[in-house]
Amino acid sequence: MNRIAFVFTHGPHGDAAGREGLDALLATSALAEDIGVFFIADGVLLLLEQQQPAQILARDFVATFGVLSLYDVDSLYLCAESAAERGLDADAGWVLNAEWLSAADWRQRLSAYDTVMTF
C-alpha cells in the first residue's frame, strides 16, 4: 500500500498553496487509505479558528479542514516548534485536533511515507 503524506508549509492567505493542497488532499483521500497530514512552518496558521478571510476578499477554505475525518484522514500532525515560534499554543483555537510533535518526531513520522507532497 502506498503511504502518502501532505505537508502544508504556507499560511492560509497570500498564495493558493494551502487551498490547492487541501483540494489535492481531498481528491487523494478517495484513492488512498494511508494518508498523513503535516502542518509545519506557516502551515500551522491554516488550522487557526476565527479567521476572517472576507476582510481581505479571500475565500474561506480553512473550515474545510474540519471535514477530513469524514474522509477517514485521521493522521494529523502539527509542529510544536512552528506553533511556538508564532506565539501559538494548544489553547489558541484550532479547526482540527492534530497531534503536536517536536520537529524531530514529525521528521521521523514523515520518513515512513512513500510519497510526500508539499504545499
Swiss-Prot record:
Its main location: cytoplasm. Keywords: Cytoplasm, tRNA processing. Gene3D superfamilies: DsrEFH-like. It is found in: Cytoplasm. One of its GO terms (biological process) is tRNA processing. One of its GO terms (cellular component) is cytoplasm. Part of a sulfur-relay system required for 2-thiolation of 5-methylaminomethyl-2-thiouridine (mnm(5)s(2)U) at tRNA wobble positions. Belongs to the DsrF/TusC family. PANTHER family: PROTEIN TUSC. This is Protein TusC.
